[in-house]
Amino acid sequence: MSKKDNELNHLAIIMDGNGRWAKKRHKPRFVGHREGMDNVERITLAANQLGIKVLTLYAFSTENWARPKEEVAYLMNLPVRFFDKYMPTLMENNVKVNIMGYLDELPEKTYKIVQRAMSETVNNTGLILNFAFNYGSRREITSAVKELGGMIESGSLKSEEITESMISDHLMTGNFGKYRDPDLLIRTSGEQRISNFLLWQLAYSELAFSEKNWPDFDKDDLKEFVDEYKHRNRRFGKVDESDS
């Protein structure tokens, strides 16, 4: 196993536990979401310092619309609060913002702020802070299949020409090139499931789970998980010679 194989270039995090964090402190759920928002800034800077190239954060799923209306309204306003508060810090640290998801379904104010964040950081060359917002992996894969099907129907593509790489290119992470698939997925709050997140891209990703709720997950926790990842034996379906 070469050292290069265990470089952590793309880290994905399911930021879970904001509500539980608030409940433990006898506070409303929105307080947990607010604290979770502030932690995004801290973890982004920590990931940047660790040399991570892409940080993908699961911020709002296509299923989250089923939550109480007041909570959804608060979550839709979080990008506005986040970028208004932290855009100067992101610019100072050369962070490039990307938002993937079905953005045209967002409220107008939310849509405008995420588009502005991407536009203002488009020339930054550091860590890519990639938010999955109004995102669902099954829908993403379905959309990719429809795109490829349309190409076949138009005659610009033959079905036998479709490859796994081509499917990857048509997913929302396709623009990340060689970094499009996460090396490591971390989920906070002790839950151990992937919740319709990056189902195709996580095929050979390493998985890790933290008992801490997202607002409590700090830079030391991140470094501990990154260090542990670097010592894992990533097989990618192959046989480890040391086991034979």
Curated annotation (Swiss-Prot):
Xref: PROSITE patterns: UPP_SYNTHASE (PS01066)
GO cellular-component term (any): cytosol
GO molecular function: ditrans,polycis-undecaprenyl-diphosphate synthase [(2E,6E)-farnesyl-diphosphate specific] activity; magnesium ion binding; manganese ion binding
Cofactor: Mg(2+)
Cofactor note as given: Binds 2 magnesium ions per subunit.
GO biological process: polyprenol biosynthetic process
InterPro entries: UPP_synth-like, UPP_synth-like_CS, UPP_synth-like_sf
Binding site for substrate: 17-21, 29, 33, 61-63, 65, 67, 187, 193-195
Domain of life: Bacteria
Active site: 16, 64
Subunit composition and interactions: Homodimer.
Family as reported in the entry's similarity comment: Belongs to the UPP synthase family.
Function according to Swiss-Prot or TrEMBL: Catalyzes the condensation of isopentenyl diphosphate (IPP) with allylic pyrophosphates generating different type of terpenoids.
Protein name: Isoprenyl transferase
Record gene name: uppS
